[in-house]
Amino acid sequence: MTKSELIDRIVTHQGLLSSKDVELAIKTMLEQMSQCLATGDRIEIRGFGSFSLHYRAPRVGRNPKTGQSVSLEGKYVPHFKPGKELRDRVNEEEHVPH
């Protein structure tokens, strides 16, 4: 699902807010979450999951085209850990292959 599809679903489901209001709310929420992670803070949404940063240590990688070794610096990457309610709900639903 894309961001615009999410906006359309919310507008259709609740019917009280305009598409522009829902779009602004989602953009604001995502911006705040991004800023929070950028400062190293953790985000927890009960029943859904938590977002945090994980550190990836420096390592030697390979250029897939040339096979040449490349030194990669250490970096922080966003990590999502689903909550128990989300895991349970996903496992209850029937999955249709894409």
From Swiss-Prot:
The protein's matches in Pfam families, at most eight in alphabetical order, are given as: Bac_DNA_binding
Read off the InterPro entries from this record. Answer: Hist_DNA-bd, Histone-like_DNA-bd_CS, IHF-like_DNA-bd_dom_sf, IHF_beta
Entry's Gene Ontology BP terms: DNA recombination; regulation of DNA-templated transcription; regulation of translation
Keyword field: DNA recombination, DNA-binding, Transcription, Transcription regulation, Translation regulation
**MF GO annotations:** DNA binding; structural constituent of chromatin
SUPFAM superfamilies (alphabetical)? IHF-like DNA-binding proteins
Q: Which domain of life is it from?
A: Bacteria
Give the GO cellular component terms, alphabetically.
chromosome; cytosol
* Family as reported in the entry's similarity comment: Belongs to the bacterial histone-like protein family.
User: Function of this protein?
Assistant: This protein is one of the two subunits of integration host factor, a specific DNA-binding protein that functions in genetic recombination as well as in transcriptional and translational control.
Subunit text: Heterodimer of an alpha and a beta chain.
Q: Indicate what this protein is called per its UniProt record.
A: Integration host factor subunit beta
Annotated source species: Pseudomonas entomophila (strain L48)
Q: What is the lineage of its organism?
A: Bacteria, Pseudomonadati, Pseudomonadota, Gammaproteobacteria, Pseudomonadales
